[in-house]
Amino acid sequence: MQIFVKTLTGKTITLEVESSDTIDNVKAKIQDKEGIPPDQQRLIFAGKQLEDGRTLADYNIQKESTLHLVLRLRGGAKKRKKKTYTKPKKQKHKHKKVKLAVLQFYKVDDATGKVTRLRKECPNAECGAGTFMANHFDRHYCGKCGLTYVYNQQA
């Protein structure tokens, strides 16, 4: 029977084959006509790539069917070397969750029941009410806006 093979250039070649022929045999015949080695050939029929060991009958290829010939691409992305680091990775700061942390910000006087703030609140408008400043040994610091008040140092 006669089948057609459409090459990359759009040229159509005709091959005389039997339905019992394997795909390997068809590729060998294409090599004889076109000079393309069989290991670089990929034959496609009805959207499926044809495997070398199978026959034309396995793929239901009949007389005057058209196979499409495309070339196999070799390779891919360049292999990358694994990075080696000279120093160990820096440990990230872990946020310490303190239960009932609000109790550290205010003090209730037992006798009068009056509430007093233990920490200074940030006066900046962008921070808003309830944003307390961190109490360092020599300054008050707002972590939200960066406002800093340094204590007067007596010499």
UniProtKB/Swiss-Prot annotation:
Gene Ontology CC: cytoplasm; nucleus; plastid; ribonucleoprotein complex; ribosome
UniProt keyword terms in alphabetical order: Cytoplasm, Isopeptide bond, Metal-binding, Nucleus, Ribonucleoprotein, Ribosomal protein, Ubl conjugation, Zinc, Zinc-finger
Cross-link (Glycyl lysine isopeptide (Lys-Gly) (interchain with G-Cter in ubiquitin)): 48, 63
Keyword Metal-binding included in the entry's annotation: yes
Zinc finger motifs (C4-type), residue ranges: 122-145
Family: In the N-terminal section; belongs to the ubiquitin family.
Lineage of the organism: Eukaryota, Viridiplantae, Streptophyta, Embryophyta, Tracheophyta
Listed SUPFAM superfamilies: Ubiquitin-like, Zn-binding ribosomal proteins
Name listed for the protein in its UniProt record: Ubiquitin-ribosomal protein eS31z fusion protein
General remark: Ubiquitin is generally synthesized as a polyubiquitin precursor with tandem head to tail repeats. Often, there are one to three additional amino acids after the last repeat, removed in the mature protein. Alternatively, ubiquitin extension protein is synthesized as a single copy of ubiquitin fused to a ribosomal protein (either eL40 or eS31) or to an ubiquitin-related protein (either RUB1 or RUB2). Following translation, extension protein is cleaved from ubiquitin.
